[in-house]
A protein has these predicted regions:
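An N-terminal hydrophobic leader/cap segment in hydrolases
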Residues: 16-67
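Catalytic histidine-centered segment of alpha/beta-hydrolase-like enzymes
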Residues: 249, 274-286
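Catalytic histidine neighborhood in serine/cysteine hydrolases
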Residues: 259-278
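Membrane-embedded segments
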Residues: 71-152
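Short alpha-helix in the alpha/beta-hydrolase fold that links the catalytic acid
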Residues: 110, 225, 251-260
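Primarily recognizes the serine-hydrolase "nucleophile elbow" in alpha/beta-hydrolase
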Residues: 152-156, 161-207
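Active-site nucleophile loop of the alpha/beta-hydrolase fold
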Residues: 127, 193-203, 221-225, 274
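Short beta-strand/loop motif that positions the catalytic acidic residue
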Residues: 232-236, 240-243, 247
Length: 296
């Protein structure tokens, strides 16, 4: 299909990339030794490490495929999407970090809406060990990836003078929190968008894998978003929280906790019928982002 309508895009976005976090797939005895495989199921759905959809498949014409080099020698794949209509351009670049399954190509419908409808540059970053990127994922590695992406945008001739918005979904939200907290005093992050993000992996385990709740302390991939968010001291960076109230993987209470902890200027939008993977397809989702971009 060479051209997709908005209705087509929304239908595609409702396709579940992951029925449940990998933690539910194997016994609790494997939590410690196999946790990276469970937390970062880069091969779900099948073929995700080799079959990466391209922008033209979604009618996106003004886009680049980019390779970034990390300081520790990995190559990250990414897409840069440009606004289709300069007359509605918000002069901002939205850096997107996706959830723990699939690849950056699966999220191109989101990028198309951000670029074509909202008029933003959209830099869709891939993690190490996902899609066409090299390496193996880990909390430490993804933190390096996030910093590499942010530095690339900061120094990109076309993007460096735009407002930078960092937008993360689920695991990508945890990376967003870590990245923004580490870079808050540089002064070039204009906003943060978090969707269906957990407080920490250890606190999430009892929800997705009750039989393992007593050994969650063994989890070394911690992603302590609640503790990291509480360390924000530059409180003029605005945050937008987007929460699906029917999220079957990350309890909505975790998003409320993050919202409560966040010391920055913040706004909250909830979607009564939003599940973990399809909140982005709920009515009003992109309206909330549009309003955030206009007012912040």
């Amino acid at each position: 299909m060479s051209y997709w309508t908005l209705a087509d895009l929304i239908s595609y976005l409702r396709m579940p990339f992951l029925a449940g976090w990998g933690l539910t797939a194997l016994g609790s005895t494997l939590l410690y030794f196999r946790q990276n495989d469970l937390i970062y199921p880069a091969n779900v759905p099948a073929g995700s490490r080799t079959q990466v959809p391209e922008p033209t498949q979604f009618g996106i014409r003004n886009a680049d495929s980019v390779n970034l080099q990390t300081p520790d020698g990995e190559t990250l794949h990414a897409y840069l999407l440009r606004p289709a209509n300069s007359s509605i351009s918000k002069n901002c670049t939205i850096i997107t970090f996706h959830g723990n399954a699939g690849n950056v190509g699966h999220r191109l419908p989101i990028g198309k809406i951000l670029a074509d409808t909202l008029g933003c540059y959209c830099f869709m970053a891939e993690y190490r060990g996902y899609g066409l990127s090299t390496g193996s994922p880990s909390e430490e590695g993804l933190a390096i990836d996030g910093q590499t992406v942010l530095d690339y945008v900061r120094n990109h001739e076309e993007l460096k003078n735009t407002r930078i918005i960092v937008y993360g979904q689920s695991l990508g939200g945890a990376l967003t929190v870590k990245l923004v907290q580490a870079n808050q005093h540089v002064g070039d992050i204009a906003g943060v968008i978090l969707e269906n993000t957990f407080t920490s992996i250890r606190k999430l385990i009892p929800s997705v894998m009750p039989v393992a709740k007593w050994i969650s302390v063994l989890c070394h991939q911690t992603w302590k978003s609640d503790e990291t968010l509480a360390k924000m001291t530059k409180t003029d960076i605005p945050f937008l929280f987007l929460s699906g109230l029917k999220d079957e993987i990350v309890p909505p209470e975790m998003m409320r906790t993050l919202h409560s902890i966040c010391p920055c200027r913040k706004s909250w939008h909830e979607f009564p019928n939003g599940h973990h993977n399809d909140t982005v397809a709920e009515p009003g989702y992109f309206d909330a982002i549009w309003a955030f971009l206009i007012h912040e």
